[in-house]
């Protein structure tokens, strides 16, 4: 009996303390914060984010409370931005105040303590590693020079689909493999051995790192941190990834050169690691974090966008016919197809824009407000977590007619770019933290898609109609298809 009473006293004391802390934090907030739903003690609005994808649920909140709304996630005061003006102020007008990233348990473990590019704090380390990657790998000039790799790998993929003519094939799996090989050869000078193992490690770790953890929203609780069992699973996954990457880097250091005959980006990072004049030391974890970025962002996002574009075209046969007619007329008789040729394909590029609008690679862009700021008239306190709902902005009827309909023709009337200037369409972000691999990613989307539409007439498996195509998104940091896309390739005969 005494033990039971003691536990009751402890629990009541802890809850009372947490409630008092909750009220104390609320009292410290400025008066002019963005509006938000009524919240519960302790958990805030966590109960409103159950049973769906975060970008969908947060859209419901901003539709009711306005495009700039606050959500209390446990101890964490957060603000959702779901309008072009709010995104423009945060990513352009006040960019330095919002250029930082917040991290959680999953990203801290799998992205090597934020020594990578994606989750790095906005500091000299980030500036240095970004500059190296852009100058050595991701500049438009460099991206064009890798054209022969895209052509080589697409030729292999086309032969594979030709050998499966008339049979259902897992297009998702084959495109993922092809994009992964392109990225590997470009970044590391050769295809990675045991590529399927690395892809599986990255996909599984992304799934684990994207999960919800109570310890993330109650960072002051040592007990929740101790009981966060997924943290221990993540560390075991990190150990498996470390073992793979350590072996890969050891082989890389002893090889004479890659297929380019000179330095690749890993060689450059190692050279700068040994250079005493390098401003910020480059660690082995930093190099591994970069490799993880390449495969988690560079591979998954490009492949996912190709698959979303194909999925939408299969649902709208008239759009597919228009895209194929343009591709086949423009590329007729051309043996080498890359960025220069694809640049002429106005409608195909609109198809890609529309796929990115409806299915952005990163549905929500995380930022951290490091200094008290004002966005659309509301006060955003320092250290507020910012979630820019790119998915919601891309489907807002204020900016898009029939926003949920796939319609590439809409860009004939209102052209919009996807490089961060038009805030109605920001799949790669904008400002200082815009995706550094933007041009590389677009090349790895547009060139393969053009080739697939040129060489094949795509059919659905027997008994399946366009209405049966599963368009469900997977939960996670990126927004790929939940289930694989299965299609039947039919070789296109230009003379038929």
UniProtKB/Swiss-Prot annotation:
Heme binds at residue 435. It is an enzyme of class 1 (oxidoreductase). Disulfide bonds: none annotated. Its main location: membrane. The monoterpenic phenol thymol is widely used as a fragrance and a flavoring ingredient in food and cosmetic industries. Its derivatives have also several biological and pharmacological properties such as antimicrobial, antioxidant, anticarcinogenesis, anti-inflammatory and antispasmodic activities. Medical applications include the treatment of disorders affecting the respiratory, nervous, and cardiovascular systems. It may also act as a growth enhancer and immunomodulator. GO terms for molecular function: heme binding; iron ion binding; monooxygenase activity; oxidoreductase activity, acting on paired donors, with incorporation or reduction of molecular oxygen. CDD domains: CYP71-like. It is found in: Membrane. GO terms for cellular component: membrane. It is a single-pass type II membrane protein. GO terms for biological process: terpenoid biosynthetic process. Pathway: Secondary metabolite biosynthesis; terpenoid biosynthesis. Its EC number is 1.14.14.-. Its cofactor is heme. SUPFAM superfamilies: Cytochrome P450. It comes from the Eukaryota. The chain crosses the membrane at residues 1-21. Coiled coil: none annotated. InterPro entries: CYP450_71D, Cyt_P450, Cyt_P450_CS, Cyt_P450_E_grp-I, Cyt_P450_sf. It holds the Pfam family p450. Keywords: Heme, Iron, Membrane, Metal-binding, Monooxygenase, Oxidoreductase, Signal-anchor, Transmembrane, Transmembrane helix. Belongs to the cytochrome P450 family. Involved in the biosynthesis of phenolic monoterpene natural product thymol which has a broad range of biological activities acting as antimicrobial compound, insecticide, antioxidant and pharmaceutical agent. Catalyzes probably the C3-hydroxylation of gamma-terpinene to produce thymol. PANTHER family: OS06G0641600 PROTEIN, OS08G0105600 PROTEIN. This is Cytochrome P450 71D182.
């Amino acid at each position: 009996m005494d033990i039971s009473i003691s536990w009751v006293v402890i629990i009541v004391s802890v809850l009372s303390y947490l409630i008092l802390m909750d009220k104390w934090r609320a009292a410290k907030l400025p008066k002019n914060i963005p509006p938000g739903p009524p919240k519960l003690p302790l958990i805030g609005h966590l109960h409103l984010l159950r049973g769906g994808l975060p970008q969908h649920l947060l859209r419901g909140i901003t539709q009711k409370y306005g495009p700039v709304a606050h959500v209390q996630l446990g101890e964490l005061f957060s603000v959702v931005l779901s309008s072009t003006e709010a995104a423009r102020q945060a990513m352009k007008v006040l960019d330095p105040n919002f250029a930082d990233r917040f991290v959680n348990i999953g990203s801290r473990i799998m992205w090597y303590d934020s020594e990578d590019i994606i989750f790095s704090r906005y500091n000299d380390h980030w500036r240095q590693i970004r500059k190296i990657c852009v100058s050595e790998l991701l500049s438009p000039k460099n991206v064009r020079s890798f054209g022969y790799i895209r052509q080589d790998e697409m030729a292999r993929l086309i032969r594979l689909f030709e050998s499966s003519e008339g049979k259902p094939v897992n297009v998702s799996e084959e495109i993922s493999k092809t994009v992964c090989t392109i990225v590997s050869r470009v970044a590391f000078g050769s295809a990675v051995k045991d590529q399927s193992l690395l892809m599986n490690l990255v996909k599984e770790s992304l799934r684990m790192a994207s999960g919800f953890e109570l310890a993330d929203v109650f960072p002051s609780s040592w007990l929740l941190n101790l009981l966060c069992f997924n943290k221990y699973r993540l560390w075991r996954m990190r150990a498996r990834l470390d073992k793979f990457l350590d072996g890969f880097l050891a082989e890389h250091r002893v090889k004479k050169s890659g297929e380019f005959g000179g330095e690749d980006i890993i060689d450059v990072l190692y050279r700068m690691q040994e250079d005493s004049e390098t401003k910020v030391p480059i660690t082995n974890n930093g190099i591994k974090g970069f490799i993880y970025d390449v495969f988690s962002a560079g591979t998954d996002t490009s492949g996912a966008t190709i698959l979303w574009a194909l999925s939408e075209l299969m649902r709208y046969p008239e759009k597919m016919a228009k895209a194929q007619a343009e591709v086949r007329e423009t590329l007729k008789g051309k043996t080498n197809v890359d960025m220069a040729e694809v640049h002429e394909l106005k409608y195909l590029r609109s198809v890609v824009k529309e796929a990115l609008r409806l299915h952005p690679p990163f549905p929500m862009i995380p930022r951290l407000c490091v200094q008290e700021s004002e966005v659309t008239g509301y006060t955003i306190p320092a250290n507020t977590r910012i979630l820019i709902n790119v998915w919601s902005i891309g489907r807002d009827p204020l900016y898009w007619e029939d926003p949920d309909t796939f319609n590439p023709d809409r860009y004939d009337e209102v052209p919009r770019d996807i490089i961060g200037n038009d805030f109605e369409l920001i799949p790669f972000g904008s400002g200082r933290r815009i995706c550094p691999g933007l041009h590389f990613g677009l090349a790895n989307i547009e060139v393969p898609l053009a080739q697939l539409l040129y060489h094949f007439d795509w059919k659905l498996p027997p008994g399946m109609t366009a209405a049966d195509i599963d368009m469900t998104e997977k939960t996670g940091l990126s927004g790929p298809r939940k289930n694989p896309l299965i299609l039947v390739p039919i070789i296109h005969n230009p003379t038929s």
